[in-house]
Every structure is written in C-alpha cells, then in structure tokens.
Amino acid sequence: MKNDVISPEFDENGRPLRRIRSFVRRQGRLTKGQEHALENYWPVMGVEFSEDMLDFPALFGREAPVTLEIGFGMGASLVAMAKDRPEQDFLGIEVHSPGVGACLASAHEEGLSNLRVMCHDAVEVLHKMIPDNSLRMVQLFFPDPWHKARHNKRRIVQVPFAELVKSKLQLGGVFHMATDWEPYAEHMLEVMSSIDGYKNLSESNDYVPRPASRPVTKFEQRGHRLGHGVWDLMFERVK
C-alpha cells in the first residue's frame, strides 16, 4: 500500500489547489495484526488510488450491484454488510490506515470476496475513479460533525459533494447517511432537500427509521449511552 494516502489536486498549470478537507489525518499506530493484514491482504483486497476510472466487473470478477461506503472506521459494519449480502459488491474508503488494516483482517477472517478497500480521500476517489451512474448505493455513516460553527464548512455533506454523489449513483440509487449529532442531521436534510434530482425516502419528508440493513455501529452505541438520538437519511436519485 502506498504511503501517499492524500494527494493534492492540481490545476491545468500544475499548481496545487487548496481544498477544505472534511477530515483530520489521525494516522495512529498500527497493531501487529493490522500491519500483518496490510502487508498480506492489501494486495488482494486493496485498491490503489489512480486517475483511471474503475471497471467494477473487472475489479470484482462479476457483474453485481456496487455499494460505496465512505469513512468505514474500523470496518465492522462494512464487513457485516458484505457478509450478509454476498450477491452484492462493496467498496469501502477510509483515510486512516489502522482502520483499513482492521477491516482487511476481518474481511479475510470471514473469507469475503465481494469487498475491496481504499485508503485515500473519498472526494478525490469519487472525482477520479468512480464512473458516473455506476453505484447502487453510497453510504456515509457518522461522519465528523465538526461541532463548532466556524468549522461547519468542513462537513463533508455540502451541496457540491451531494451533487457529486448523485452523478455517481445509478437512476434509482440511494445516498444513505446517518449521524448522532442532531444539528448535522438538520444540515444534511437542508442540503439534500435543496438539490434537484433527489427524492427523500422518508414518509414524513425528514428522517427514516434505521434500516435493518445497517448494522448498529460503535458510534451509534456510544450515542445511545450518551442519550443521543441517531438520525438516518435516505435519498434516491430520481433523475
């Protein structure tokens, strides 16, 4: 796995572009198990960043619906979903290598062949590597809420990002978000409702109950312990 996880973008003259990141790089120390997984399982399940569009049938060796998960943390819920839905393919993106190592170790232990992972900035991956109209679902669970008002612009869910996601979804594909921070849920709802071509799948036109397909994550468990609610939003691409 390459170490240049986050690559700068450049303009047409080769000058680097400054873009606000939605995450802070917290590399962390790899455990021996995570290091072993990165060394041994990355060559099979890892996908290096490039500026070439992915060919999903070639990547997975078959034609199947593809779900992209952005920011999978340690990968527990992503591995659980891939295990429960062997007829579907999953691509996970995470910027922190300990999480990637943990996910690879779990996926190997479960013997999964329908999961691939990347260690890179998801926005760059969407721009450079994900073909338009190719995804059945995009999942964004418990992204950093950037609580302070002056940091709200760092939240990943903004209009340009949601438009980018829509372009990568197939017609009928779904963008599924979840957060345990109510102001961020309200922000997500405002952003998504402002974009033409998305349909809110909530009967009350706001939030949906947690789908059975989404495993309860450690972040959700933490939220429950702290007395927080959890808000799921699901928006379908309709045009």
UniProtKB/Swiss-Prot annotation:
Substrate binds at residues 148, 180, 217-220. Pathway: tRNA modification; N(7)-methylguanine-tRNA biosynthesis. It holds the Pfam family Methyltransf_4. Changing residue 151 to A: Reduces catalytic activity over 10-fold. GO terms for cellular component: tRNA methyltransferase complex. It comes from the Bacteria. It is an enzyme of class 2 (transferase). Its EC number is 2.1.1.33. Residues 150-155 are annotated as: Interaction with RNA. Changing residue 150 to A: Reduces catalytic activity about 3-fold. InterPro entries: SAM-dependent_MTases_sf, tRNA_(Gua-N-7)_MeTrfase_Trmb, tRNA_methyltr_TrmB_bact. HAMAP family: tRNA_methyltr_TrmB. Belongs to the class I-like SAM-binding methyltransferase superfamily. TrmB family. This is tRNA (guanine-N(7)-)-methyltransferase. It comes from Escherichia coli (strain K12). The lineage of its organism: Bacteria, Pseudomonadati, Pseudomonadota, Gammaproteobacteria, Enterobacterales.
